């Protein structure tokens, strides 16, 4: 019995020593082959000339400089562009493949397939409340309507800037605007806004707080009204609350990755004159109205000039989050 155990142990020991010897031999052979191969390459290298397909960059200097055979990174190769258009555009064009056609045309301007998104809206006023501006660059096409000239100017102000808003309870409280960035924004099917400024004793200045007919009317039957009153003065408000909502808003700053293109109209709507618009960068443009195909062709042709007036937003952002917070 003990003899069998000794024999088994001896067998394992011999196998282990044999395996160790074989592995050492294999390592020596591989070393010999590798070293010989490297030696041959070293000898033949000066005699062989081959094309270098790599990029030869100097060790020193700015990596932003353009070198021969290097690849430049363009804005549109790493960015997304959203083009927002009214529903009537698709209705007039009446072509199921019109977006594919435009995508191919955008490629000629350096925007690859998949980087341009076409987004339809039904009503510009509703769109301005919840614009969903997710792309790095966002271009909004807004057709001019002479009957809504002031509304369009205010809609552009909403789209091109970020706002922080809170509901107003005008039945219980007086309100005042703290500075030029503080506005009251009213929206609805019909907004009539009346105000009564108050003195330090909460008595009306030129009006009676108990009689709304003596209030000063500053907006009449408008769908959108951005109200600006004298800063630092309490006001009692009267608003047609059945058809309108009013909110106390603060302009946080420009959405620099958004541009508005006015389609048609004799004059371009200019909101840069507003002292709260800073920096004074023009991101409001106009295209002569003919047909929607002509409008889109013009946008494609000048897309890179339009983008140059904007700043890329590096992260996706639900812009509506800046509008109404309770």
From Swiss-Prot:
- Enumerate the glycosylated residues: 69, 238
Q: Name one Pfam family in it.
A: VP7
Positions annotated to bind Ca(2+) 2: 177, 228-229, 231, 301
What processing steps or modifications follow its translation? N-glycosylated. The N-terminus is blocked possibly by pyroglutamic acid.
A cellular component annotation (GO) from this entry: host cell endoplasmic reticulum lumen
Q: Organism's domain of life? A: Viruses
Identify the residues that bind Ca(2+) 1. 95, 206, 214, 216
Q: Which GO terms describe its molecular function?
A: metal ion binding
S-S bonds: 82-135, 165-249, 191-244, 196-207
Subcellular location as annotated: Virion; Host endoplasmic reticulum lumen
Secretion signal, residue range per the UniProt entry:
1-50
State the UniProt keywords alphabetically.
Answer: Calcium, Capsid protein, Disulfide bond, Glycoprotein, Host endoplasmic reticulum, Host-virus interaction, Metal-binding, Outer capsid protein, Signal, T=13 icosahedral capsid protein, Virion
- Annotated region (CNP motif) at 165-167
Q: Which InterPro entries match?
A: VP7, VP7_1, VP7_2
Q: What is its main location?
A: virion
Region span, GPR motif: 253-255
Q: What else is known?
A: Some rotavirus strains are neuraminidase-sensitive and require sialic acid to attach to the cell surface. Some rotavirus strains are integrin-dependent. Some rotavirus strains depend on ganglioside for their entry into the host cell. Hsp70 also seems to be involved in the entry of some strains. In group A rotaviruses, VP7 defines the G serotype.
* Described function: Calcium-binding protein that interacts with rotavirus cell receptors once the initial attachment by VP4 has been achieved. Rotavirus attachment and entry into the host cell probably involves multiple sequential contacts between the outer capsid proteins VP4 and VP7, and the cell receptors. Following entry into the host cell, low intracellular or intravesicular Ca(2+) concentration probably causes the calcium-stabilized VP7 trimers to dissociate from the virion. This step is probably necessary for the membrane-disrupting entry step and the release of VP4, which is locked onto the virion by VP7.
Subunit relationships: Homotrimer; disulfide-linked. 2 Ca(2+) ions bound at each subunit interface in the trimer hold the trimer together. Interacts with the intermediate capsid protein VP6. Interacts with the outer capsid protein VP5*.
Instruction: Give the family from UniProt.
Output: Belongs to the rotavirus VP7 family.
User: What name does this protein carry?
Assistant: Outer capsid glycoprotein VP7
